[in-house]
Amino acid sequence: MIGMRPLRSLLASLTAVCALAAGVTVAGTAGPAQAAASDCTGGARGFRDHPDDASGDTHKPRRIEMGGGIVITLEKGVYVGQQIAFGKISGPTFPGDKVWMDWKADGWDQGGPPGTAIRPWLQCGPFTVQRIGQSLTTPFKRTSTDPAYQFRVCGSLNSNHVVRCSEWW
């Protein structure tokens, strides 16, 4: 017979493996280099604003089921002939739910004012749901095939404030 302590340890390990297999990270990572919506709105750092009801291609590179039918996705699409990525929260959202997109681009992040390199990444957001059922997107940015140029989507619900992030894409 397995004792309760080893069983709990086994279940915790299995839960962690399942979360990793699903491509989901639950909190506990290093913080971003910067965390202000103004770092990626209004054309800052090459990000572009677009409507909150925007959707990308049918294939979503990353998807997190937040619970209660609320979904956070990393969307991709095409804008003026270039592939782009952005984050989105949708479903029966509530005021205070949040979405943001992290961008890391080692070697691509130079050229700004001194001291503004993006290390370890730039957090684009958070953007906060204002009304029940509101879909909300982050600004978009062009993508690259360079493995040093990556995105992930993160979010939290007002009901529990647990931050969840997808794997990098």
Predicted regions and their residues:
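Post-signal peptide N-terminal regions of Sec-secreted extracellular proteins
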Residues: Q34-W169
